[in-house]
């Protein structure tokens, strides 16, 4: 069995790309799938070719071609394809194959391909015969390529990977396997230096670097929830082994230089390195036979040399022996780096007929194009909504001012002491035509129903988190200090923060809903009168005796009415302007402009250009400028209305100071004004109810996504917990066997974990040189 590790492939299941990508093209990109029939079939064939991984050149070709095409597709398709589900199984943790991670993301698929490319190169490195310089050189290159694949995954894959799809692809896990590959590449270079007869000081520096790289891989492994304890023990042993080798070679160098005291100190340092962390019997149970043999070999050699050196120094040389802590540090010699194949570093450039094949879906309009269209539409909506809000605020300000001035009630009572004022008739007709009373009551029920549904959905999501937290606390009590993972609120901090936000949204919305219902309750009786028609209005409105008007009143009434008509005229103009603005937005089609710009960019650059949303921003920004004139017009309306309201306030004060009203006239004025106020409030609350429905519908979507994320989080935690329990159980069992009399040192040690067997794995023999430093 080899004394180095290969990374097992992640496994996947078949996916129907013909249907999945075809549906995405039609539903998310709004293009006919028939135009891409041949491309869809080729894409499906490419994925089917990677379903049965093998450590050979043919499978490498399949993986590389699919990876390059997939990289190109991410420039065309959306990040999430609603009609696709990619299913991948991890193969590192104890419960690796228990359940897959599922995602609709092409980027997730691409990350798994990068991982398997790194795995493939690691297996090809192990499969090479490392008994001669050529074989070691090939392994050296393969391990660096494997590290390069994992480095691309770290730099270009993990940052954009969804947090809930990280199981098996955690940052710590990938950093661990990357540094493990670099350590094994450095080990191959060190082995070549032995074969070539390099001087001892150089071999020591190379070995020191091997130890440092294993130490780095070990540090990442101890942070990762995926790396098994067998691998941790393997890397620990390797780290200490090569540290011992480095000191041993420096001891040989000291002997050659007649520094006999330093030789003894170096040999002692070598033995200390082996004893630190590798001397326990339990650790050795987890080592493969070849690694244990390497360890025993270096112990035997160092022990014998130390006996000889101490004897010679005591009898012949009589040199002082320095403390091991006083020895000069061994300068490491780094000879490895992450070197991904150029086809993986720049995959799109290799999509040519004579290399990785021509790119698929070239004629598919990029998703960035559709994003630009959607973003432009959203920006238009924001502008138009802002203008509409400004104009509605004008109307609300007008209504509030009229209420404070008791208009038009006071004027109507003077102009028409009997009967129903024209404004009241108009209000009544509008409310009846809109079924205002029934509509508002139904709207209140709708809002209450939506609010209740939102609360129930959020409570269900909260219950999911509560159950997970209870389970984690139970397992933490059961396993005591062995339960080393983060507690629920730390691990799911983003979810608990989001829960608090959503709860606050519901609380604030509930308070607003209560306020709206209170306003509607206040005007319910008056609304029922307006909704009932003229007979009810005549019964409600008292008549007053028509008296003689003073000259001042006769002069002020038409002036006051003109100002009120001016206000109404401004309101009508605002409504008409909004109708025209809505039509303008409806006919605002910038797709031809964006398409022309996109084609120009492609012609100026190259056919494989990766278009992003930023490429379209200059065009969309320029097109949005056409709404500047509308924004300016809306701002002017507020100023125009304020001028009229100022004049109306002065005229109304003069008018009221000139009135000599009896009780009947006052009662009539109050009745008319109460109906006016009810109408104004009706208009305002109607808008609030519409906004409430829209708010809850949007919030329900957000809560639904949150609930789904909570379930996925709990699933991830269950898998993580099962893995941790399994590891703790295995450790306890091993400790029990070791302390309970099962101490047969000849028993077969545990092998390093592997999910699949690499073919033609070469054996590492003592003649390879590792046992003897």
From Swiss-Prot:
Compositional bias (Basic and acidic residues): 726-741
Cellular component aspect of the GO annotation: endosome
Region (Disordered) residue spans: 726-758
Record-annotated BRO1 domain positions: 3-398
PROSITE patterns, per the entry: BRO1 (PS51180)
InterPro entries noted in UniProt: ALIX_V_dom, BRO1_dom, BRO1_sf
Family membership noted in the UniProt record: Belongs to the palA/RIM20 family.
Subunit and interaction comment: Interacts with RIM101 by binding to its two YPX[LI] motifs.
Function noted in UniProt: Required for the proteolytic cleavage of the transcription factor RIM101 in response to alkaline ambient pH. May act as a scaffold protein that recruits the calpain-like protease RIM13 via VPS32 to its substrate RIM101.
Protein name: pH-response regulator protein RIM20
Organism: Yarrowia lipolytica (strain CLIB 122 / E 150) (Yeast)
Gene from which the chain derives: RIM20
């Amino acid at each position: 069995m080899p004394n180095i590790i290969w990374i097992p492939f992640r496994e996947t299941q078949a996916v129907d790309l013909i249907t999945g990508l075809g549906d995405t093209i039609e539903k998310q990109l709004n293009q006919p799938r028939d135009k891409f029939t041949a491309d869809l079939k080729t894409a499906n064939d490419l994925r089917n070719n990677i379903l049965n991984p093998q450590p050979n050149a043919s499978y490498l070709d399949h993986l590389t071609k699919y990876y390059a095409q997939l990289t190109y597709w991410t420039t065309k398709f959306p990040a999430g394809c609603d009609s696709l589900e990619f299913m991948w199984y991890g193969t590192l943790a104890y419960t690796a194959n228990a359940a897959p991670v599922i995602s609709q993301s092409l980027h997730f698929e691409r990350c798994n391909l990068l991982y398997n490319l790194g795995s493939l190169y690691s297996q090809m490195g192990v499969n090479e015969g490392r008994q001669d310089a050529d074989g070691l050189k090939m392994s050296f290159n393969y391990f660096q390529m494997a590290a390069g694949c994992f480095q691309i995954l770290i730099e270009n894959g993990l940052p954009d990977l969804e947090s809930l799809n990280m199981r098996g692809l955690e940052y710590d896990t990938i950093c661990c396997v990357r540094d493990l590959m670099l350590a094994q590449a450095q080990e191959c270079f060190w082995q070549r230096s032995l074969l070539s007869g390099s001087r001892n000081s150089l071999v020591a520096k190379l070995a020191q670097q091997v130890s440092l790289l294993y130490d780095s891989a070990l540090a990442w492994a101890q942070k990762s929830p995926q790396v098994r304890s067998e691998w941790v023990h393997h890397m620990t042993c390797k780290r200490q082994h090569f540290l011992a080798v480095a000191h041993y070679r420096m001891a040989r160098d000291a002997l050659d230089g007649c520094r006999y005291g330093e030789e003894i100190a170096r040999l002692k340092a070598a033995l200390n390195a082996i004893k630190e962390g590798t001397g326990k019997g339990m650790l050795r149970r987890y080592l493969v036979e070849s690694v244990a043999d390497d360890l025993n070999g270096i112990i035997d050699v160092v022990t014998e040399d130390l006996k000889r050196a101490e004897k010679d120094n005591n009898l012949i040389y009589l040199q002082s022996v320095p403390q091991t802590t006083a020895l000069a540090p061994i300068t490491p010699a780094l000879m490895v780096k992450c070197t991904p194949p150029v086809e993986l570093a720049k995959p799109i450039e290799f999509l040519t007929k004579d290399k990785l094949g021509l790119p698929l879906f070239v004629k598919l309009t990029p998703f960035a194009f559709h994003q630009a269209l959607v973003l432009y539409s959203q920006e238009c909506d924001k502008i138009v909504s802002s203008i509409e809000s400004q104009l509605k605020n004008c109307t609300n300000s007008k209504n509030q001012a009229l209420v404070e001035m008791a208009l038009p009630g006071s004027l109507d009572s003077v102009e028409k002491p009997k009967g129903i004022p024209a404004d009241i008739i108009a209000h009544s007709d509008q409310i009846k035509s809109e079924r205002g009373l029934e509509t508002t009551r139904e709207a209140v029920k709708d809002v209450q129903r939506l609010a209740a549904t939102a609360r129930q959905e959020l409570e269900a999501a909260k219950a999911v988190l509560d159950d997970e937290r209870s389970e984690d606390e139970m397992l933490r009590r059961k396993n005591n200090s062995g339960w080393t993972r983060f507690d629920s609120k730390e691990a799911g901090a983003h979810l608990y923060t989001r829960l608090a936000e959503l709860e606050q949204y519901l609380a604030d919305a509930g308070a607003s809903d209560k306020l709206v219902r209170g306003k509607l309750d206040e005007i319910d009786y008056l609304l029922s009168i307006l909704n009932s028609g003229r007979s009810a209005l005549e019964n409600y409105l008292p008549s007053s005796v028509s008296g003689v008007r003073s000259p001042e009143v006769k002069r002020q009434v038409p002036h006051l009415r003109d100002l009120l008509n001016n206000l109404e005229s401004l309101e009508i103009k605002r409504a008409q302007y909004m109708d025209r603005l809505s039509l303008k937005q409806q006919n605002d089609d910038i797709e031809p402009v964006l398409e022309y710009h996109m084609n120009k960019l492609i012609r100026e650059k190259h056919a494989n250009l990766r278009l992003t949303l930023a490429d379209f921003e200059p065009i969309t920004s320029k097109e949005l400028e056409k709404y500047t004139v509308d924004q300016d017009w809306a701002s002017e309306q507020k100023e125009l209305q304020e001028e009229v309201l100022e004049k109306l306030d002065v005229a109304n004060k003069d008018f009221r100071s000139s009135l000599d009203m009896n009780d009947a006239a006052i009662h009539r004025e109050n009745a008319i004004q109460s109906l006016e106020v009810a109408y104004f409030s009706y208009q305002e609350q109607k808008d609030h109810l519409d906004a409430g429905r829209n708010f809850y519908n949007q919030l329900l979507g957000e809560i639904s996504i949150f609930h789904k994320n909570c379930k996925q989080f709990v699933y991830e935690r269950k898998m993580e917990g099962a893995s941790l329990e399994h590891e703790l159980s295995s450790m306890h069992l091993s400790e029990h066997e070791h302390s309970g009399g099962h101490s047969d040192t000849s028993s077969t040690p545990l092998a390093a974990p592997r999910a699949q067997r690499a073919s033609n794995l070469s054996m590492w023999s003592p003649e390879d040189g590792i046992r003897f430093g």
